[in-house]
Regions:
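Extended, low-polarity segments enriched in aliphatic/aromatic residues
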Residues: 1-133
């Protein structure tokens, strides 16, 4: 609900206008861990790397237009592997194609999600990409 979303986005700060980006990313990882712990091995993670905007999905139609080209669809039974592969594919794009998205990820401490997921033993950051055409 509204209160839970506010706590997640503000790292449970009493001042909802100031919060730690790093703590927000850790909250996101902890939320994902609760879900993965509940479902166990009965879950598959799918990342669709298409129409990627620098804004959160929650921005809806107000989101900035996509500036990163479509990459594809990734799937795994390992949440950390699929997220690491997604970041690696974005960061491997030519500078002009990745600049805006990479800057947003780095300036918002988005990579902290991956390192914290590893600290929480949520998966493996090593992966093998298998292309299906």
């Amino acid at each position: 609900g509204r209160i839970g979303k506010a706590k997640l986005h503000t790292a449970d700060s009493s001042n909802h206008w100031e919060y730690s980006q790093e703590r927000f990313m850790e909250n996101m990882a902890e939320s994902a861990k609760a879900t993965t712990d509940f479902f166990g091995k009965q879950i598959i993670y799918i990342n669709v790397l298409r129409n990627m905007s620098v804004d959160c999905d929650c921005a809806g139609l107000a989101a900035a237009p996509p500036t990163t080209p479509d990459i594809g669809i990734l799937a795994s039974t390992d949440i950390l592997a699929v997220d690491q592969a997604s970041i690696d594919l974005v960061f491997a794009l030519p500078d002009a194609a990745k600049h805006d998205l990479q800057e947003r990820i780095e300036s918002r401490r988005g990579l902290r999600q991956l390192s914290y997921m590893k600290e929480l033993s949520m998966g493996n950051d090593q992966y093998e990409l298998i292309t299906i055409e």
